[in-house]
Amino acid sequence: VTVYGIVDTGVAKQTGKDTYMTHNYESSLGFRGTEDLGNGYKAMFQLEHRLNLNDGTVYGGNPDIDWYGGANVGIGTPFGTFRLGRVDELPTETLRTLDPFNQDSIASMTLSTQRSTHIDNTIRYDSPNLSGLQIGATYSLGKNTKGSDRDNAFARAGADNDGYAGSVLYDNGTVTLLGNWSRLADSNKSYIWNLGGAYAWGPLRLSLAYEKTHDKGWYNAERSLSENSGVADSSLINGVA
């Protein structure tokens, strides 16, 4: 079993506002373990808690999610890895490889309205690394629409749906190429797709990504940003050097 984590905090001051505590990366404490089953198979698990260091509250604003950073079990095989539970979302995880700030600070690439860092009730598959090429896929079960959400508004609107995603990533150390397509569960079948790449010359790395969002007004059983902003479709281009 491996115990891991990060503790990050700082003090910031903005003109016209009081001095306050903040962070560049969220603090976390996690537990990760594997058990060799022989013949190329292994069992695995992950539990990761996220917290706000300044007051000890749960990171993410939802006190009902104790293991915000991940809660899953899985099995590794010669044919790939299978995990079940709360896992990292493929489009966010892969696109982060193009961002030196890991999409987690003021200079990071902006998340779209239909991308999430983690997704629940999910079966995830990751292929073996084949000379730099990896393929991933997820299938997410929608929520139980019989009383598990606030007033069942999304169910009555017909916005409840299962979710799935596919990802292709190639990285040989110098060249990185990737593509994703994703539909979140309980999003009224909203979806995003993105393409990106990077090239490294010694210590210099240039990256570019394009993302297209089709937001139908729901985001994981909650009304999305497009409900209030009037923006249902958006495109995003990011470049980082």
Annotate the PLM regions.
Residues V1, D64-G70, A155-G163, A232-S234:
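Glycine-rich, flexible loop segments associated with nucleotide phosphate handling
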Residues T15-D18, M109-T110, G147-F154, L225-V231:
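Extracellular loop and loop/strand-boundary signature of outer-membrane beta-barrel proteins
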Residues A159-A241:
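Detector for outer-membrane/organellar transmembrane beta-barrel domains
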Residues E93-T97, K146-S148, N188-Y191, G217-Y219:
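A short, polar/proline- and glycine-enriched secondary-structure boundary/capping micro-motif
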Residues A137-T138, G142-D160, A165-G166:
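Outer-membrane pore/translocation modules
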Residues V1-K13, K17-N144, L169-T176:
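Outer membrane beta-barrel
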Residues K17-T19, Q114-D120, G158-D160, L184-Y191:
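Solvent-exposed loop/turn segments connecting transmembrane beta-strands
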